[in-house]
């Protein structure tokens, strides 16, 4: 949410977040966001949140944090509730990417690939003797963020 707040806060009005973490729920609610308290693996929660009429659905929780479900199952549920929505899913393993597409995802992000891209830039900075500059750049970015979970 912090990235959206920084880049295009007007989008926040169009977003509904589903979360069962009370800290996340309270923090986002206090910021004026539309938050539904519930488990994303529960079909009733998805219906209550309006998944059936959403244009874009982002499943950002990796399988390792999901209880009783996985992203493939969630994509199938969401796709059955909303055949026309654009669905973005998260994969931790490259071997999961094709399964998520087959389940109905329109786009699959593999977070460790973006992490690897960032880490490579850190390695380049270290090799160029610019690691302190890279850290200062990152510290400045962190200072302007308002993350939901610290």
Language-model region placement:
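Cytosolic regulatory regions of ion transport systems
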Residues: 1-150
